[in-house]
Amino acid sequence: MSVVVQHVEEKAVHSWSRISTAGKKALEEALLVFNPMSQDLSATEAQLVAFLQGLRDDGFQPTILRSGDVYGYSSCTANPPSQTKLQARAPNPTATSPPASAPRTAMRLPAGRATLLPMPLSGRLAKASTPALAKHATTNLLLSSLKQSSASHARGAAVGFPTHLYPGVYPAMRLSVVLEALVPLKTPMPCLGAKHKAQSLQLSLADSPLKLRKSSGKGPGNPRPKAPRKTTSKGPKCLTRKGPGAGPRRGSGHQSKTNRATGSPSVRRMKGGSALGTKTAQAKVARTLAKAARAQAKVARTQAKAAKARAKAKAAQVKAKAKAKAAQVKAKAKVMAAWAKAKAKAKAVRAKAKVARTQPRGRGRPKGSAKARTTRKGQKNRPETVGQKRKRAEEAKDLPPKKRTRLGPRSPKAWLGPGTAKLLKFRAIKVDRRSSDDEVRQRAQRILRVNLSPVIRLQPLLPYSAV
């Protein structure tokens, strides 16, 4: 059952835990008999009374509770019938009073609580439940309480389940409150407070069949504001409370006199039971809250520890990633430097090889020098005329001096060592007609102080200087 109230589920859990203490067999039987979604209300009510009788035969002390005690919603808002009408409709108490030997198994129940079913079902249920209980010779307590009132359907609905407050709740669900009857509630419920003004009915069990009678009460000047707990040798028993505005409680004085005469422990323990139960409940709630707070603190610490571990792992991962990236950049720079160095070295080797290929071989003279020398030798054999010499001199003056292309590099210091470069005082050896190969070689050796190098260039003298 699910109700909008927040604390309803907790109360349901407590009630189920109390049911399980009565034994597995009783729990299974209760589940089979009192299915909240049952459609057969007549059979369910008949089985309800039979089940209560069977529990009493087995030694249990079932206590019928209101739905508000179990599920949390308050049924005290219903308007109970007036006391005058109840007194007029109630049967003769002397005819329904049980023997005096059954005071220990007697239990008190509010009048509004006994009407667990709507009023329109009372007539059919009375006929259907009578043959089902013939074996136990038992009177249907629920129907007996309903027979006391012959009011209209509206009055019956007001006394019974508040259908206007919970329209979606099926009426048969109210029968499931009897599951709470195996073990009574440990603490009094607030819905049993001063709102309830109806007279309480006392259900007693003896060797004879179940009977319905009014409970005995004190005078009008002593209303009971709280519901104490009655403790017997078989277990605790929940007693209902009356509001401060309730009227006198009618019933047979024989029961109360018997209790006073026998000195039952319920009379002596009635005063401090409610306060003790309330303190116990408050202490239990405080312990539960403290335990929940400790659990929440433990969960928070665990979450903080996990978050710290995740942050630490993330920082270590970022640090490792940065370190790997720096190592990768360093390795890449190292590779690039080695590649550039190798490239420069290869380029220098290629340039050196190219220069070696372009330089002349042999005696170190340009190729055109031998031809010029042979030409000059041929001219020496044929003496020039005066007119030819004058003409060649004039042409030489008119023409600008020609720039001879250098076959080697511009600076011979690039191919010579620092010590050898200092010995080089001239860049070229000037020759004329009278210069021979031996003279040129000797001049070069004097300049370089080494063997002849291909860097030395031969430059012929101008024609006019040779005259």
From Swiss-Prot:
Gene: CCDC71
Name recorded for this polypeptide: Coiled-coil domain-containing protein 71
Source species, domain of life: Eukaryota
Ranges of biased composition (kind: Low complexity): 88-105
Modified residues (Phosphoserine): S129
Pfam family, one: CCDC71L
InterPro entries: Ccdc71/71L (IPR026695)
Family annotation (PANTHER family): COILED-COIL DOMAIN-CONTAINING PROTEIN 71 (PTHR14484:SF0)
Sequence segments annotated as region (Disordered): 81-105, 211-280, 349-416
Keyword Membrane appears in the UniProt entry: no
Bias kind Polar residues: ranges: 253-265
Biased composition (Basic residues): 349-380
Keyword Phosphoprotein tagged: yes
Key words, A-Z: Coiled coil, Phosphoprotein
Residues forming coiled coils: 279-359
Organism: Homo sapiens (Human)
Biased composition (Basic and acidic residues): 392-401
